[in-house]
Amino acid sequence: MEQTFEAFVVRKDDEGFRTGIEQWTTEQLMDGDVTVRVEYSGINYKDALASTENGKIVRSYPFVPGIDLAGTVADSSHPRFQPGDKVLCTGYETGVSHFGGYSGLARLNGDWLVPLPNGLDARDAMAIGTAGFTAALSVQAVLHAGAEPADGPVLVRGAAGGVGSMAVAILSRLGFHVTASSGKKDEQGEWLKSLGAAEVIGREEAAPAARGALAAETWSAVIDPVGGQGTADTAKYVKYGGAIALSGLTGGGGFEGTVYPYILRGVQLIGIDSVYCPMDKRLGVWSKLAGEWKPEKALSSGIQEIGLDGLRPALDRILAGGAVGRYVVKLG
């Protein structure tokens, strides 16, 4: 039976580029074997780019962005899911080449869905979202590389952002001494400390200019959702055997550096991909996020709830670099 719902739609046609809230029907949804009644979505930098004409995310129009969603299965022909099941979705093609979460209903490939784990509701799942999932993958990577609380401070770059703030909360919960680095030190320092940061420093303080290829061993590990030249600069300060978990490029897609931190100190540079993360690994990380790694401090502060009518201004704030913490988008 055809159903109607609201969706935030991006259009580009003879009338130009525009975004807005529209009334859609299920006939307009893309193919998939599970239909989800969306309760919450989130906002990520990729979503903000998808809402712009030159963001290089969306390839065909009209389009519904939103790479994250959580809700209840309304209809399913997938063997793993039945109507009434609580699910979440992050990554894969959702919100990139397949209509995403800024919609009252979403029809998806059931292989992309994660059963909502015990310990999380839809709102908390989207407050965590891709950002928190990426943060957890990053923390897991440095743990697997051997990081332990006794090794000394862990640096979190871009700590006021979604990935960074979630990483601060998770690492603090695990007993690490967390140094939060941010370009918004003065405005967000107290908030970052409330998440568990032991100290908050400016981005330049994380890796002061050093003449040589190596600098004083300072960081036992680095959570880096920023990228750019700061990644190479920070590597000079990583302790012997430490690791950098790199997940983003808001600071740029390239850097210049030397091999010395990697071959003389055994520093590991670990790439973090949350989009196509295998399902078995994905399920394990979400289970931790609902339990022993649940970022309670981040979920209790710094989360702003909006509706579809507040989505365009929030996307613009993210594009302008003025957003702090996480947004959740309530649907229905």
Say what each PLM segment does.
Residues 126-204:
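Mid-domain Rossmann-like dinucleotide-binding core that forms the NAD(H)/NADP(H) cofactor-binding site
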Residues 229-295, 330-331:
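Glycine-rich phosphate-binding loop and adjacent beta-alpha segment
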Residues 3, 283-332:
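C-terminal hydrophobic helical "lid"/dimerization subdomain
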Residues 90-155:
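NAD(P)H dinucleotide-binding glycine-rich loop of Rossmann-like/cofactor-binding domains
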Residues 27-43, 54-94:
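Glycine-rich beta-strand-centered segment in the early N-terminal region that forms part
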Residues 68, 85-86, 105, 153, ...:
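Residue-level marker of beta-strand positions
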Residues 206-217:
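Short amphipathic alpha-helix with an adjacent loop that forms part of the alpha/beta core around
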Residues 88, 220-223, 245:
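N-terminal Rossmann-like NAD(P) cofactor-binding module of classical short-chain dehydrogenase/reductase
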